Each structure stands twice: as C-alpha cells, then as structure tokens.
Swiss-Prot record:
Its main location: cytoplasm. This is Ribosomal RNA small subunit methyltransferase H. The keyword Nucleotide-binding does not apply. InterPro entries: RsmH, SAM-dep_MeTrfase_MraW_recog, SAM-dependent_MTases_sf. Keywords: Cytoplasm, Methyltransferase, rRNA processing, S-adenosyl-L-methionine, Transferase. GO terms for molecular function: rRNA (cytosine-N4-)-methyltransferase activity. The lineage of its organism: Bacteria, Pseudomonadati, Spirochaetota, Spirochaetia, Spirochaetales. Its EC number is 2.1.1.199.
C-alpha cells in the first residue's frame, strides 16, 4: 500500500501562481484537498517561510500525507474535515494568501481504497469518501433508485448519452440479484453499450455520476466558492483544479459573477496540462485550472 502515490496535477502552474504574490513573512497557503500532500510538499520545499494548512476529510489519506510531510511538521497544520465545513466553522476571522482546491480523487482511492471507485478492481460498491459519515452509497443507489431517478442521475451528472440503456440493464439485473461490486456494475454497463469501440471505458461516465452524487461534490463546491473568496487576504489568490465540465462550469460562472473592480480573473481560459505532463501523469488529461485574485481587504 505504501508505494501508491498520487502525482499532483498542474503543479508547476500552481507554483507559478504562488510566485506572483509570495511574501517572505506570514504567507499562509491553504490546501483544501490535501490528499497525499503533493502540492503542499512542493510549496513547502520551495518557500522556506511559507505556512500551510492542509484540509483532508479522509483520515487514512491524511495519515499518509503526514508521513510524507513529516519534515515540514513545524510549518504545516492539519484539519480532518470537509473543506466547506472548515471555512464555515474555523476561519471566520482569518485571511489567507493562497487557497488551492484540487477537486480530483486521490490515486489512493482508485488503487487501494477498497471503496469501489474504480471498475478496474472488484471492490464493494460504496464510493463514499468517508463511510463513517453515513449517507447514501453507490450500492444503495443502483439497487434502490427507480428508473427515472437513475436515468436523471447518470445523464445529468455523467453526461451519459446511453443512460436509458444502462438503467434498463441495471433494472433487469437487480430483479434477480443485488449489484454488489464495482466490477459487477461495470459488466452490466458494458453489455448495455452498443458494440462499437469508444475512447473511454463505457462505465466511466456512470461511475463519475455515482461518485459525484454520493459525495455531494457539486453542491459542496457551490457552498465553498463564496467562503473561499471571503477568506482571501488582499491580493490573495484562489486556484481551483477541476476534472469534468460540470465542476468547471460552476467555477467559471462564479468567477464571471465577481465584481470586476474587486477581483481579477487570472485565467481568461483555463490552464490545462502540457503534452509532457500528460505523458507521465495520465490523470492530468482532463484537469483545468482557473484562478482569481482578490484586490481588496
């Protein structure tokens, strides 16, 4: 398990943004999605006087990050909570120089998390980032939601053109058996798809839709955006890395709605990964980085 590490995406671009506003004293960088600490480690290594707050809800992943960042223990503090809860409860009277939110799922969850995020492994169908929080699981959804609910979920959150065919196959299957595992669901989806070649696995969009719904990803992002902006210091930067069009649209529209004399959008078009990065970090293919600077106190 120890050798599975998440490679941070668009790392050089994040560092370049930090460089534009870095102050040698009292600079605070908030990593809203610490994961295994890749972005934070790079920032702490490059800037000797920077302090980091790392937010990570998954305590297993957080412990892995702490191991990776042990040499920086005097300059980093941790919060084991969701990022929207952190800003609601703990930072009402603080201002931060840089806030980063990388909305991708850690490689740990895909490779060894055991929660059914990946159809490449035969795991229990769960997809909750933190199961002890309770809430609905992917297993609950595929085995209890009715036809209309499933079709809407898969189409709207996954952009899946064949949502009706997939749902029909799911409903037929569960007449006989419960859908227990990620590989089981993947097989059902693949059989429902037309017999032609596609660039991505037929199950990709459905799995995305389930993960988004289970973890309340879009509403959590919507709740967080005004909190992040409110907690920036003057000349502070908010940088957000998204991985699908639904997230990117939310961020884009929020930035567009900000008052122009109080905020400066730093990315007229989103920053995407270079050809070189795509070669060594496949996860970066769909990553988009948008950033905005706050111009007032």
């Amino acid at each position: 398990m120890g050798d599975i590490f998440h490679i941070p995406v668009l790392l050089e671009d994040v560092i370049n943004l930090v460089e534009t506003i870095y102050l040698d004293d009292g600079f605070v960088f908030v990593d809203c999605t610490l994961g295994e600490g890749g972005h934070s480690k790079a920032v702490l290594s490059k800037y000797q006087n920077i302090n980091v707050i790392g937010i990570e809800r998954d305590d297993v992943v957080l412990n892995r990050a702490k191991e990776s960042l042990v040499e920086f223990s005097k300059r980093i503090s941790y919060s084991n909570t969701w990022f929207d809860d952190f800003f609601c409860k703990y930072s009402l009277h603080r201002r931060f120089n840089f806030i980063l939110a990388d909305l991708g799922i850690s490689m740990f969850h895909y490779k060894v998390g055991g929660r059914g995020f990946s159809f490449l492994e035969d795991e229990k169908l769960d997809m909750r980032l933190f199961p002890s929080d309770g809430g609905i699981s992917a297993y609950d959804i595929v085995n209890t939601f009715d036809k209309e609910m499933l079709e809407n979920l898969i189409y709207e959150l996954g952009g899946e053109y064949y949502s009706r065919r997939i749902v029909k196959a799911i409903l037929e299957y569960r007449k006989i058996n419960k859908i227990q595992t990620s590989r089981e669901l993947q097989r059902i989806i693949c059989k429902a798809y037309p017999n032609v070649k596609f660039k991505i696995n037929p199950a990709t969009k459905t799995f995305q839709a389930l993960r988004i719904y289970v973890n309340d990803e879009l509403d959590r992002l919507k709740r967080s955006l005004p909190l992040w902006i409110a907690n920036l210091s003057k000349n502070g930067i908010l940088a957000i890395i998204t991985f699908h069009s639904l997230e990117d649209k939310i961020v884009k529209e929020f930035f567009k709605g900000l008052t122009k004399d109080q905020y400066c959008i730093l990315t007229k078009k989103p920053i995407t990964s270079s050809f070189k990065e795509k070669q060594y970090n496949n996860a970066s293919r769909s990553a988009k980085l948008r950033a905005v600077k706050k111009l007032y106190e």
